[in-house]
Amino acid sequence: CPNDLGRDAELAAKVGQQTGFQIILATGLYKQSEGAYAYWHFRSNFGESIVDLMADLFIADLTEGIGDTGIKAGIIKVASGPNEITEYENNILLAAAKASVATGAPITTHTDQGTMGDAQQKILTDNGVPAHRIIIGHSCGTDNHEYHMGLARSGSYLGFDRFGIDMVFPDEKRISSLVKVLKAGAGDRVVVSHDSVWCWKGQPFPPGMLAQVPDAFDPTHFERKIIPRLREEGISAEQIEGLLVENPRRFFSGEKLSALA
């Protein structure tokens, strides 16, 4: 989660310590319709550079720690809504680029309905971020193969990262799109996951939500249901290992990707 979606650094650290999972916290800001737009709009009335203020916040989270916790973020999260990037969202992208260039931190994005990932990529790379340091998140929100391959050829990672949320886009279409990308030779630039929230501001999940998307809140869903389907489609164990282990390792280590035809 970015800064304005209920991020809890101390809870994440505690979970990581007790489970052994390596949890990488994010800094960043969410899209205009659901994030902290009102606050930043208010700040803009005082003649300050909103991009600089945002970038300073991201850099502090990455280099000094989140608030007074001493826990540092390790990635920048940005977002845009469907079919357009608003001025506010553009400012977030510019601030993220500035912070990434200053610190070397990678960036992951939120997209809606499989749109605007190419525009996000262009804004970030035009402002100095190497393409291989970017994940275009929720790329699995569309089955547009040319959109996927355009992002891949431009050197960024595709986030097929919403498995289990069939009400947004069905898993079978996600699987089909992922298989096409893998068979097109772009399997080294795909990362996979669920898009799950594990703590709802300290309260139980609303029962109605759980009933609608039970797989979204099952951390074994990808292993139990998606991997077998990938195998049925001819995806090898080596390719699956790449999705789960090698690609995330390469992304966070900053290794460059080879050119894609």
Each model region followed by its residue ranges:
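Divalent metal-coordination and catalytic microenvironments
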Residues: L29, S100, L158, D195, ...
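N-terminal hydrophobic targeting/anchoring segments and the immediately downstream early-domain regions
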Residues: C1-A38, L158, I227, F251-A261
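Mid-to-C-terminal alpha-helical segments outside catalytic/metal-binding sites
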Residues: F217-A261
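Active-site core of metal-dependent hydrolases
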Residues: A102-R174, G208-T220, I227, E232-S236
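Alpha-helical scaffolding segments of alpha/beta enzyme cores, especially the outer helices
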Residues: E10-K14, Q18, L57-A60, E64, ...
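Short acidic/histidine-rich active-site segments
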Residues: D161-R162, A186-L210, I240
